[in-house]
Regions:
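N-terminal amphipathic/hydrophobic targeting modules at extreme N-termini
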Residues: 1-9
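DUTPase catalytic domain/fold
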Residues: 21-198
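Short, Lys/Arg-enriched N-terminal segments with co-localized hydrophobic residues
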Residues: 11-24
Length: 198
């Protein structure tokens, strides 16, 4: 009889030692990212090749932010809640002409990348913050860092200020980086956030 463990880890058996199994994922290097961009497999618009790092691509902050307003009573967090209910409790602000959005201590807002990224069906991605900003208490994604294969979107950022400082968020800042990973098989995202917007 094949155990559940064997069924799950069977294809990783070559990477198992004394019962400990490693699940290997392939992260694209900067050179491979550049190659796939030139071949049109990954599409980033608008794009500057100077934003390619050792194993990631820097993405910049757009000029729209969604901030939350006061609401009386609890807001339900459940599977039955609408995926876009957050829009009922928030408003959009646009920052023009180099003006920043000010994020106070302990506050959260939604931002969006200037760039739209299109992934092929065999690649997924992660969005990570940058260390220089994290050291000031800035988190650019609270939990939702995974980008599905086949996505064709700007990336919405759940931005949180964990510091005691007021942070000035300037549109155009390289605020996060995207890491690309190959996956076994192919898939295509067709979920509710396929057309991302604040």
């Amino acid at each position: 009889m094949i155990s559940n463990r064997d069924h799950f880890f069977g294809k990783f058996s070559d990477h198992c030692i004394n019962g400990f199994c490693l699940i290997i994922m392939c992260i694209l290097s900067g050179a491979e990212i550049r190659k796939q961009l030139k071949e049109g497999k990954i599409i980033v618009e608008p794009f500057d090749y100077a934003n390619i790092g050792i194993a990631s691509v820097d993405l910049t902050l757009g000029d729209e932010f969604r901030y939350f307003v006061h609401h009386n009573g609890p807001v339900p967090i459940s599977d039955e809640a609408g995926a876009k209910d957050y829009q009922k409790f928030s408003r959009i602000m646009k920052c023009d002409d180099g003006h920043p959005y000010y994020l106070g201590p302990g506050q959260m807002c939604l931002g969006i990348t200037k760039e739209k990224v299109k992934l092929p069906s065999n690649l997924c991605a992660l969005v990570e913050g940058r260390s220089r900003f994290a050291r000031l208490g800035l988190s650019v994604h609270i939990t939702a860092s995974f980008i599905n294969p086949g996505s064709d979107n700007q990336t919405v950022l759940e931005i949180f200020n964990a510091s005691s400082l007021t942070l000035a968020l300037y549109p155009g800042t390289k605020v996060c980086q995207m890491i690309f990973m190959t996956m076994e098989g192919e898939a295509h995202y067709n979920g509710i956030f396929q057309d991302q917007a604040l």
